[in-house]
Amino acid sequence: MNWILSPLKVRPDHRNRIGPKAYGLSLMAQEGFNIPDTLFLTVDAYNAFVNAAGLRERILLELNRKKFKDMRWEEIWDCATRIRHLFLKKQIPGPLKSYLTDKIQSHFNGKTLAIRSSAPDEDASGSSFAGLHESFVNVRGSSSILDHIRLVWASLWSDAALLYRQEIGLDVEKSAMAVVLQETVTGSRSGVVFSQNPNDKTQVIIESVYGLNQGLVDGMVEPDRWVLDRDKKTVLSHKPAQREHWMIPSEHGVETAPLPEDLSGRPPLNSKEALGICDLAFRAEALFKAPQDVEWTIKNDTLYVLQSRPITTLSPSETQDKRAWYLSLHRSFKNLQDLRNTIEETLIPEMTKTAKDLAEQDIMVLSDR
């Protein structure tokens, strides 16, 4: 069976079966980078589920009700919702379920997992899919792990993912999904590092938060930000965050909680640690022969790499990344809170004032010109 691969056994010809995210992690593991305990579900597992559950014909039916390019956004949203609902209604078939359960239990031995997408489409297009598919952290128990694998598979068919694939010219009907299963490393500090600042090639950017990286990635927790000189490997600036919250494991996954007072007054990293993370980014850049965006976490003073991907745009003039609009279809909770505050604190008072001013006008002296 070709449903699961371990990082150290991945070969170059496996790349289109596990996607670039998983393949990149396998290269890092083979080169001695410190990554969490990991397994990869290949696209063969996805296809086995889709075929056994009879979903392929249903997906084609939904996609061909009308020419995709002629669909309005709300029609695409309806189509995507129906397809994803099909994934969630269908159970993983017996042989595949037994195989996955046995492999996951024997390998991870009850550990909580992070379950991440790895879409082979990224290789075909040369475009970044970061943020367009689902990822889950701190998932425990065989049943819940299998449910979340289906959720990752289903996220291949979100409205944002469908629209984005159409925009960059991919054949939506041939899409498939691989999955990364990683032991959840409950880091005390986490973040991302850009080995090359997209807006200034002489700089490195580090963003860091207390707790799990999910808070930063989802936009729920404001990060501290460091700018470093690439050549001199020195810190140029540090912009502190307000440090009010962090994301931590919970019984049902993760949750945002108030940051303890003893942490709120100091940055997640010192200068020495920032330089160490800078070195990690340079190692990743040397391995992949391209500037990298690396997610990392620190647990018990050990630095782990969670994933690494190429930086797709290196200056405003080179911007080809078309994800922004599609990512905006799904706002984070913080985005929605900010929108609510803007409406309640700015827009409504302005509208009320305008209405009051109009009410005080003498309409008899108004002109229609």
Indicate where each model-derived feature is located.
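A generic structural motif
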Residues: 182-184, 196-197
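Short beta-strand segments
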Residues: 116, 182, 207-209
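Conserved divalent-metal-coordinating catalytic cores
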Residues: 1-31, 37, 43-44, 50, ...
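N-terminal beta-alpha lobe that positions the nucleotide/phosphoryl donor
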Residues: 1-180, 187-189, 269-272, 280-286
